[in-house]
């Protein structure tokens, strides 16, 4: 399964909320943690940093993780599904800066997915 080869970013606006997505090369959980810390610092105004990763452990086994960071609509799982569908290893993260309008679980999930697809489509593989 191919890794994400280079950092690829994409952002969208949905009803004044900003969604900043990145497909990030990461081979280990330690790299995932470091990259997440960078994203949280870069987008410090974001209320949510949802992410999913597929990396290898020390024995070469595939490890999958996803986090919603308190966001509704299970965006972490939507991001993990995108990594699975594209058969990619690495980190997919989306940071949301709330714009004052609630999108509801369906709208939030769609917005996270659209932002992440944009990052993948900009050839981060």
Regions found by a protein language model. Give the residues of each.
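C-terminal regulatory domains involved in ligand/effector binding and gene-expression control
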Residues: 1-74
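Solvent-exposed alpha-helical segments within well-ordered globular domains of core cellular machineries
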Residues: 30-37, 81, 110, 114
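Generic structural "secondary-structure junction" signal
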Residues: 45, 55-57, 74, 81, ...
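Glycine- and Gly-Pro-enriched alpha-helical subdomains that act as flexible
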Residues: 94, 101-125
């Amino acid at each position: 399964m191919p890794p994400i080869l280079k950092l690829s970013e994409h952002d969208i606006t949905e009803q004044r909320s900003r969604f900043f997505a990145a497909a990030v090369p990461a081979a280990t959980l330690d790299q995932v943690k470091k990259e997440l810390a960078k994203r949280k610092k870069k987008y410090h105004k974001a209320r949510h940093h949802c992410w999913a990763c597929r990396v290898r452990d020390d024995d070469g086994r595939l490890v999958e993780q996803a986090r919603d960071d308190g966001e509704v609509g299970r965006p972490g799982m939507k991001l993990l599904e995108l990594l699975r569908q594209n058969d990619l290893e690495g980190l997919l993260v989306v940071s949301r800066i709330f714009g004052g309008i609630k999108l509801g679980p369906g709208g939030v999930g769609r917005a996270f997915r659209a932002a992440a697809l944009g990052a993948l489509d900009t050839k981060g593989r």
